[in-house]
From Swiss-Prot:
GO molecular function list: methyltransferase activity
Site (Important for activity): 60, 247
Phenotypic consequence of residue 61 to A: Almost loss of activity on vanillate
Effect of loss of the gene: Disruption of the gene leads to significant growth retardation on both vanillate and syringate.
Pathway: Secondary metabolite metabolism; lignin degradation
Chain residues that bind substrate: 31, 60, 122, 247-250
Pfam families given in the database record: GCV_T
Impact reported for residue 247 to F: Loss of activity on vanillate
Biophysicochemical property: pH dependence: Optimum pH is 8 with vanillate as substrate.
UniProt-recorded name of the protein: Vanillate/3-O-methylgallate O-demethylase
Function, in words: Involved in the catabolism of vanillate and syringate. Catalyzes the transfer of a methyl moiety from vanillate or 3-O-methylgallate (3MGA) to tetrahydrofolate, forming protocatechuate (PCA) or gallate, respectively, and methyl-tetrahydrofolate. Has similar activities with both substrates. Cannot use syringate. Uses an ordered, sequential kinetic mechanism.
Source organism: Sphingobium sp. (strain NBRC 103272 / SYK-6)
Length: 471
């Protein structure tokens, strides 16, 4: 029997899809190339709240360059977001859904110029765009610049563009020093230009750490020149670079769930897409980790309302999945929250590592990011032991002195309710390479606002953050 060549064949050969993904051998999700730490992850987390940081986003995301007279139509047809009023020098958080209304992924779309866009984000939404560009009769050209290898093994790495963010309460001081004068603070997700070391650099008003800042990018060959200039200008303001260890944990404070399971494994309307996706695609090799267990892969799917993307849904245009979303009552859907994990229970998890007489310790909780799969799914339980939600992104904030997770829970559960998160996997753990033999623990966790950071809740200008759960 020949080896599978596409996702549909992988699924047919793999038996139960949940079992296949929960036992994937892909390993941990890696943020490649960037050094794990430049100082230490605690100081780096502290700096994005108290001084300024340089995030290096050059290597861990797919860049998809989309050009042509149908480029805007391709995006409009595949996104829940409204295309009305979208024009060059504005960006959107692009969210596509399946014909059944479930989220595929998300990313940022930069409207660079007439008929010219770039998507930046994880693979699932990029793959969806490429599929429709190739099969939908659109007059577009696509350049796919894949993320850097997770383990380059000493080989040179090349991208089309470098991508940084300058963030933190003193970020604008750094930015204006670099620029050589006052720089207008544009509205959220608006684009402009600034000067860095004699170069004209494009900018996006953005923030990931709960304070206004800029995302900036340029040709890859100018990366070192730009980076050195930023670090030099930032010295007097306490700016430090953030490594790949701390970087992904910033979303625990700002409230974005980066990795919902792409909801494409079932449904006749998606069969052609599964046949298009190669056997080594993100979707075919990705891993699910956590205590939530169902034999039905669809129980891991989420719709936009469940992870805070309700404000993006606009029925002012035709798009894939519109009919399914129109049939949903948003008020009855699960809602995104932060769960603040109990400190005493966390101490118990770590104490178990030093218990020489126990048969097994609790699942290791890595710091600052505790996820151990591409897609994370821990069961959230109420006092009666009923599953009332799914915890989807987990780690520790040195700024808050808390273990936190981003979750979607039943809509009627108010902020302040104590629930439990079942930490670890059943029966000693699955066969994933990231899972050691362990036992499970029910960790108390209080339903809390999202974003958890007060700064993020009060200063963000865009999208779902203004519709944050606060009560």
């Amino acid at each position: 029997m020949s080896a599978p060549t596409n996702l549909e064949q992988v699924l047919a050969a793999g038996g139960n899809t949940v079992e296949m993904l929960r036992n994937s051998q892909i390993g941990a999700y890696v943020y490649p190339v960037v050094a794990p730490e430049f100082s230490n992850w605690r100081t780096e987390q502290w700096a994005w709240r108290n001084s300024a940081v340089l995030f290096d986003q050059t290597h861990h995301m797919v860049d998809l360059y989309i050009r042509g007279k149908d480029a805007l139509k391709l995006l409009s047809d595949t996104m829940i977001n409204s295309p009305k009023g979208w024009e060059p020098n504005k960006a959107k958080q692009y969210v596509p859904v399946t014909p059944y209304g479930h989220v595929i992924g998300d990313g940022i779309i930069f409207y660079l110029a007439e008929e010219e866009f770039v998507y930046v984000g994880r693979a699932p939404a990029a793959n969806w765009l490429m599929y429709h560009a190739q099969t939908g009769g659109y007059n577009v050209d696509i350049v796919h610049d894949d993320r850097s290898p997770s383990r380059p093994m000493g080989k040179p790495v090349q991208r089309i563009s470098w991508r940084f963010q300058i963030q933190g309460p003193k970020a604008w001081d750094v930015i204006e020093k670099l620029h050589g004068g006052t720089l207008e603070k544009l509205k959220f997700f608006n684009m402009a230009e600034m000067n860095i070391a004699g170069m004209k650099i494009r900018t996006l008003r953005h923030g990931m750490a709960g304070a206004p800042g800029l995302e900036i990018w340029g040709p890859y060959e100018t990366q070192e020149k730009a980076r050195n200039a930023i670090l030099e200008a930032g010295k007097e303001f306490g700016l430090i670079p953030v490594g790949s260890r701390a970087y992904p944990s910033n979303t625990l404070e700002s409230g974005w769930i980066p990795s919902p399971l792409p909801a494409i494994y079932t449904g006749d309307k998606l069969k052609a897409y599964r046949e298009w996706l190669p056997a080594n695609s993100y979707e075919a090799s990705g891993a699910i980790g956590g205590s939530f267990v169902s034999s039905n892969i669809e129980d891991y799917y989420v719709n936009p309302y469940e992870i805070g993307y309700g404000p993006f849904v606009k029925f002012d245009h035709d798009f894939i999945g519109r009919d399914a979303l129109e049939a949903i009552d948003p008020a009855t859907q699960r809602k995104k929250v932060t769960l603040a994990w109990n400190g005493d229970d966390m101490a118990k998890i770590y104490a178990s590592l030093f218990d020489t007489e126990a048969d097994a310790h609790y699942k290791f909780f890595d710091l600052p990011l505790a996820n151990y799969a591409n897609t994370n799914a821990d069961a959230v339980l109420d006092a009666a032991g009923n599953v009332v939600g799914m915890s989807m992104f987990t780690g520790y904030s040195y700024n808050e002195k808390r273990a936190l997770s981003l979750a979607t829970i039943d809509h009627e559960i108010p902020v302040g309710t104590e629930l439990t998160v079942l930490w670890g996997e059943e029966n000693g753990g699955t066969r994933k390479t990231t899972v050691e033999p362990h036992k499970q623990m029910a960790v108390r966790a209080v339903v809390s606002p999202v974003p958890y950071s007060v700064t993020a809740r009060e200063t963000y200008e865009g999208g779902w953050r203004k519709a944050a759960v606060t009560a």
